[in-house]
Amino acid sequence: DLKKSKKERQKQTEINRDREKLRQEATGELRKHDVVRFANPRNSDIEKYLLATEARWQCPYTSKKYGVTDVFGDHPQVDVEHIIPRSRSLDDSYLNKTLAYRSANMEKGNRTPREWLFESDQEQYDRMIGVVSGFDPRFEVGKKLRRFSMELSDPDSLLKEFTERQL
């Protein structure tokens, strides 16, 4: 943070304030649902709710909508998914996560979305990019879109960025 200019630090403070407001809204929305654990939602529940809100409750890989019970029910069908596999990027940040139907997540495996779909199913790849482009603009859609459309060799550059941020 010391390397950043005053303007950059102010911008980051504003982003952090906006994120906290979104987290408070998510907590309030979760408490409206008749689920005992939502009286005091866990951070993982809040994150899932934010990811669902960001994606407009739609799986980017299948384009199918999902609901609260698909995410939080006794037998959830939707999981938190690392866009760039965590094993390849070491990135467990919010920006590298989305919600996806379990079946699509399993099929994607340890590949980037581009590696998985670009060559094998261009139509599905284009649909996915369309879904991600339509994510809620209150979130950092551009940065997420970059991860969804990343070239085969790009995860290494992400790892370098991540490492530099941590130093």
What kind of feature is each model-predicted range?
Residues 48, 52, 56, 63, ...:
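Short, well-ordered alpha-helical packing segments
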Residues 64-99, 108-115:
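Histidine-centered nuclease catalytic patch
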Residues 1-67, 90-92, 138-159:
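Short, charged surface segments at domain edges that flank catalytic/cofactor-binding sites
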Residues 94-167:
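Domain-exit/linker segments immediately C-terminal to small folded modules
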